[in-house]
Amino acid sequence: MRSLDNISWERLESEGFVCYPAKSQDGPGEEIIFYSGFPTPTGRAKIVPTELVPPDELPDEDFPLVLTTGRMLEHWHTGAMTSRAKALNAQEPEAVVSMHPKDIGRMGFTRGQKVMVETRRGEVTLTLRADRDVTPGMLFMPFCFTEAPANFLTNPQLDPYGKIPEFKFSAARIRQA
């Protein structure tokens, strides 16, 4: 990536860190971007409030949980490059679904067991992980594992403005695999 051209492995190893973006190979990088202004006619940021658009699909009796998808630290995006890194795979070797510990106990599951996460679009088998950072009533799946394609489970309904699918909110259920 051109934006990383001035941040080499050698530089990271010798300096410990480099602020991004770095405009030259020996420059410190920009700690604060847009310090001298934003790329607008006034130089000020343009902040536009939006109206809240409710999700297209809400939890119900059949699918009482909310599935949200996202990234994980060890595998970037789809894992196309990071899944080949032995060190990263050693830290996160398999697809997981994270759930609040109270939900795990309330629903009779145990940490580490194989579960099936299902939405109206399909189902995927994963290992269950307890995570207090996941809101009760929600499931979190990273989308980087090809063997457990999280975004195949999400609602394809597009946001009316951004034209982005609802990757962050899909009605779901979980059961023993």
Where are these predicted regions, by residue range?
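Long, contiguous, secondary-structure-rich segments that constitute the structural scaffold
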Residues: 1-15, 78, 82-98, 102-177
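Long, low-complexity segments enriched in small/aliphatic residues
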Residues: 1-87
